[in-house]
Amino acid sequence: LSPGGALILVEFHPLIWLFDQQAPVDYFHSAEPDVETQKGTYTDGGEDVEITSCYWDHSLSDVLAAMRKVGLEVTLFEEYDHSPYPLAGMVERAPGEFVLAERAQQRLPHCYAIRARKV
């Protein structure tokens, strides 16, 4: 980014993965990825395709430290108690608001948004 340029990041809150009963993860980053193999893709068609994905989890402090390291200054940080996208194990609480089914009565952070500017 050029000085004064803006970065907008909207991501799943790392806390949400702690409640995944099928594949619990650690909150803090590890050198080894979580590996997941699934059939099909998120698009229509391609059901006969098998995809292996690697994921690394990053705590909020990891994300904020990485931004600071490259000269970004956070100007906004917000957390949301729902996801705009349904993941496995979620139910629709209101139109376009998905929450973990087993924790629907709790207000947990599902996503967060950060706006930062290049200093």
Region locations from a protein language model:
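Core SAM-dependent methyltransferase catalytic element
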Residues: 69-73, 90-119
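Low-complexity, flexible helical/coil segments
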Residues: 13-20, 42-49, 64-65, 111-117
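Short alpha-helix
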Residues: 41-43, 52-79
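Class I S-adenosyl-L-methionine
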Residues: 41-51, 82-106
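Helix-to-beta-strand junctions that scaffold the AdoMet/dcAdoMet cofactor pocket
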Residues: 1-3
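Conserved beta-strand edge residues that scaffold enzyme active sites
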Residues: 14-15, 80-82
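Conserved class I S-adenosyl-L-methionine
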Residues: 6-41
